[in-house]
Design a protein with these regions (language model features):
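Hydrophobic ligand-binding cavity/cleft-lining segments
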Residues: 11-12, 21-92
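Intrinsic-disorder/low-complexity, polar/charged segments enriched in Ser/Thr/Lys/Arg/Asp/Glu/Gln
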Residues: 49-55, 62, 104, 111, ...
Length: 187
């Protein structure tokens, strides 16, 4: 299977092995994760089996939504509207986002970090994504699928490969810190 096939598989329902392969591609072939995480891949047992699916309707074009998610200045406005930085210790700039496949991003003052696995302008964003509270080397895969719906954009969002027990907090965070501020910013 080529690297391109691995990336395509990641975007459409990844298995644990595909997640690890895709993240390794995104990070230039580095071995990621703890020894336990690497053992999971070898023994085929997933300890990060949970996933999240959410949909949000944003009253804006796909281009405006894509730009808000991939442009540093736009995403800084999302962060400001979320209010989350008020409750966090100062950690530097709100966000820094590369707009290239393989490029890094740092969000919410460094609390969220990762790399872009796939960028299809105005259609799809796939990222290797992590919070600062996770064990070193643990990344989830997030996918934002942007679908035109009437005069707005439906974001079909999926996240897989995160630590067990994190689903509830992550799901609430996506709503409070992404979908609601995006709606405020773009309408």
């Amino acid at each position: 299977m080529s690297d391109r096939d691995n990336l395509a598989a990641l975007a459409y329902g990844p298995t644990r092995r595909q997640l690890i392969a895709g993240v390794a591609i995104a990070f230039g072939g580095l071995a990621l994760g703890s020894p336990e995480a690497r053992a999971e891949a070898e023994d085929g047992i997933s300890r990060t089996a949970e996933s999240i699916h959410q949909e949000a309707l944003i009253k804006a074009s796909r281009k405006r939504v894509y730009d808000a998610l991939t442009d540093t200045k736009q995403f800084d406005k999302v962060i400001q509207l979320s209010g989350v930085m008020k409750s966090m210790p100062p950690r530097g700039t709100p966000s820094e986002i590369s707009r290239e496949v393989g490029g890094a991003f740092t969000l919410f003052g460094g609390y969220i970090t990762g790399r872009h696995v796939e960028l299809v302008p105005n259609q799809r964003i796939v990222q290797a994504w992590r919070t600062g509270g996770w064990d070193p080397g643990v990344y989830s895969i997030v996918k934002f699928e942007l679908v035109e719906q009437g005069s707005g954009t439906k974001i079909a969002f999926d996240q897989a490969g995160f630590p067990k027990g994190a689903a509830e907090d992550l799901a609430a965070g996506w709503k409070a810190h992404y979908w609601e501020p995006l709606q405020k910013l773009l309408t």
